[in-house]
Amino acid sequence: MCMPCFTTDHNMAKKCNDCCGGYGKCFGPQCLCR
């Protein structure tokens, strides 16, 4: 799991994805890696 996802950050989805190495998704407040 990566950093928490903040809905106020418009780049959050990309940051989550990058953190997971290209396979991340924001699910509620959590950044989940596949």
Swiss-Prot record:
An example molecular function term from Gene Ontology annotations: chloride channel regulator activity
Pfam families attached to this UniProt entry: Toxin_5 (PF05294)
Role played: Toxin with unknown function in healthy organisms. Suppress growth and migration of glioma cells and decreases the mRNA expression of annexin A2 (ANXA2) and forkhead box protein M1 (FOXM1), two key molecules in the progression and invasion of glioma. May affect chloride channel. May interact with MMP2 and inhibit its catalytic activity. In vivo, is not toxic when administrated to mice at high doses.
Taxonomic source organism: Mesobuthus eupeus (Lesser Asian scorpion)
Entry keywords, A to Z: Chloride channel impairing toxin, Disulfide bond, Ion channel impairing toxin, Knottin, Metalloenzyme inhibitor, Metalloprotease inhibitor, Protease inhibitor, Secreted, Toxin, Voltage-gated chloride channel impairing toxin
Cystine crosslinks: C2-C19, C5-C26, C16-C31, C20-C33
GO cellular component, one term: extracellular region
Family membership: Belongs to the short scorpion toxin superfamily. Chloride channel inhibitor family.
Protein name listed in UniProt: Chlorotoxin-like peptide MeICT
Tissues where this protein is expressed: Expressed by the venom gland.
InterPro entries referenced in this protein's UniProt entry, alphabetically: Scorpion_toxin-like_sf (IPR036574), Scorpion_toxinS_Cl_inh (IPR007958)
Free-text comment on this protein's domains from its UniProt entry: The presence of a 'disulfide through disulfide knot' structurally defines this protein as a knottin.
PROSITE patterns: SHORT_SCORPION_CHLORIDE
Keyword Cell division attached: no
Chief localization: secreted
Entry's localization field: Secreted
